[in-house]
Amino acid sequence: MLRHIVLVGMMGAGKTTVGLWLSKAKSIPFYDLDQLIEGKERATIPEIFASKGVEYFREQEREIVKQVAYSSPGIVATGGGTLLNPSNLWLLKRYGRLFYLQASLDLLWTRLKNKTDRPLLLGKEPKVILEKLLKEREVLYKQADIEIAVDGRTVEELGELLWSYWETMEKTDPR
């Protein structure tokens, strides 16, 4: 394995869940950017947002992306907003293959509506906020090498499909 498998998409799309499953199934290192930031900061994402702000979080995210990009190839679960920074997108594309886990607004809402650990959704109309974020970010997610529809698929199905795409890409375009 020469490049990272980079999972991109909205919060709630299943990046961490699919990444962990694939990591275990294929014995490949797993990097969860949000978890790495939380470990570095010794605080949860909502705590970081509340105490230090979004800009500070994005700076920490940028540093973690650099570290992971240069690490041993593995599976990388990005945060929903990781690609908002052009340098993150560039680094991740340079050192990995990007897979967009595309989930419908309805599926995302079903998964997220009762969560309290999503600071960007803490407002009067969280579903409206979620829809707005999806529309704003989708153009970035679509810069991925492959788009995989999540709705109606199990974690195992998604992992195997992703791995199949990965193997084909590595054989036909090793970069």
From Swiss-Prot:
Looking at the record's lineage, which domain of life comes first? Bacteria
What GO molecular functions are on record for this protein? ATP binding; magnesium ion binding; shikimate kinase activity
Instruction: State the GO CC annotations.
Output: cytosol
Summarizing the function annotation, the protein's role is: Catalyzes the specific phosphorylation of the 3-hydroxyl group of shikimic acid using ATP as a cosubstrate.
Per the UniProt record, which EC number(s) apply here?
A: 2.7.1.71
Listed under subunit, the entry gives: Monomer.
The positions annotated for binding ATP are 12-17, 118, 153
Q: Which reaction does it catalyse?
A: shikimate + ATP = 3-phosphoshikimate + ADP + H(+)
Subcellular location as annotated:
Cytoplasm
Enzyme class name: transferase
This chain belongs to the protein called Shikimate kinase
Q: Which family does it belong to?
A: Belongs to the shikimate kinase family.
Sites binding substrate sit at 34, 58, 80, 137
Report the InterPro entries cross-referenced here: P-loop_NTPase (IPR027417), Shikimate/glucono_kinase (IPR031322), Shikimate_kinase/TSH1 (IPR000623), Shikimate_kinase_CS (IPR023000)
Identify the PANTHER family for this entry: SHIKIMATE KINASE, SHIKIMATE KINASE 1, CHLOROPLASTIC
Which organism's genome codes for this protein? Answer: Methylacidiphilum infernorum (isolate V4)
| Cofactor(s) this protein cannot do without | Mg(2+)
Q: Which GO terms describe its biological process?
A: amino acid biosynthetic process; aromatic amino acid family biosynthetic process; chorismate biosynthetic process
Known pathway = Metabolic intermediate biosynthesis; chorismate biosynthesis; chorismate from D-erythrose 4-phosphate and phosphoenolpyruvate: step 5/7
